[in-house]
Amino acid sequence: MATRFMTDPHAMRDMAGRFEVHAQTVEDEARRMWASAQNISGAGWSGMAEATSLDTMAQMNQAFRNIVNMLHGVRDGLVRDANNYEQQEQASQQILSS
């Protein structure tokens, strides 16, 4: 049974939109987490404990930033590839019609 691979630029752009929504969600949650950590930080923590807590939170914040960057990279790649596919499809149609 032969399988046909079909490229759907509109579906690729729709999926890119989903990746953007996921990136925004991760970014919003990371921002809330950071604000919460800042509020907790001053509540009875001091010295090394506070510094360690803030360092851990900074590392987590960077990890979330990396996730957001990767999601944006996937989004951008899907949009770019959808555009390239459409351009190549148009060029092929022009060649075939001439």
From Swiss-Prot:
A Pfam entry, by short name: WXG100
Major localisation: secreted
Subcellular location(s) of the protein: Secreted
Gene Ontology CC annotations of this record: extracellular region
Source superkingdom: Bacteria
InterPro entries with a match to the protein in the record: ESAT-6-like_sf, T7SS_ESAT-6-like
SUPFAM superfamilies assigned to the protein according to its UniProt record, in alphabetical order: EsxAB dimer-like
Keywords noted in UniProt: Secreted
Gene3D superfamilies, sorted: ESAT-6-like (1.10.287.1060)
Record family assignment: Belongs to the WXG100 family. CFP-10 subfamily.
Quaternary structure and partners: Forms a complex with EsxO.
Protein name from the UniProt record: ESAT-6-like protein EsxP
The gene coding this protein: esxP
